[in-house]
């Protein structure tokens, strides 16, 4: 899922050779835009534009949920629309990743499981059918915002626009992507105790933590996005430092080590 990089431009400027003065001081002319207008880009890249629209809707509904006084969509309705738009986004993204090749065999299922888009499609469907948990909206909203910013810079550059906002957006995504991925990974981990608490409060199904555990296992094993593994490693290091501290009571230290061993024993291999 972590493809927050701009694709290189395949178009190269051609040299004419006629009237060349041989002067090294003149800068080369900028390459012509790949598309003459935004409408032309949309016609040539329809799926990318549909994904962009779905991501913008995800962010829009998230803002309506997190800032209720906007008032365009009721907060309760906006919450579930976040995950509906997110599920549509990841379903379309998964379709493009597997290139529409569907088969009922073990090889196809294995290919499906390793796709990050499949992980977040499962995530979106799980929370679409569960009681509202505000933190659950954070990962899909951040992903939608990052990908939307990346798409905006791409379409503006490829249609010849020279707005000053383009380098600012590129700089923002380049500098904040790793921080955003870390926030996403931590929020996904911290959701576990919240989902367990839903069961004791009578708002959650017994199947919810098990379904979410499967999602978290897939994220941990992801070969394209190591953020979840890194977050677990950082938390493990922090807890070990606490357990080794002389001020930590021995029963607490023992409990921490047992918890670390319990979780580490269930860590899946990288796919």
Curated annotation (Swiss-Prot):
UniProt key word Transmembrane helix: yes
Region (Disordered): 1-32
Transmembrane segments: 56-76, 125-145, 180-200
GO biological process: endoplasmic reticulum tubular network organization; membrane organization
Family annotation (InterPro entries): PER33/POM33_regulator (IPR051645), TMEM33/Pom33 (IPR005344)
Organism superkingdom: Eukaryota
Location relative to the cell: Membrane
Low complexity bias: start-end ranges: 13-25
One CC-aspect GO term: membrane
Keyword Membrane on entry: yes
Protein family (similarity comment): Belongs to the PER33/POM33 family.
PANTHER family linked to this entry: TRANSMEMBRANE PROTEIN 33 (PTHR12703:SF4)
Protein name per its UniProtKB record: Transmembrane protein 33 homolog
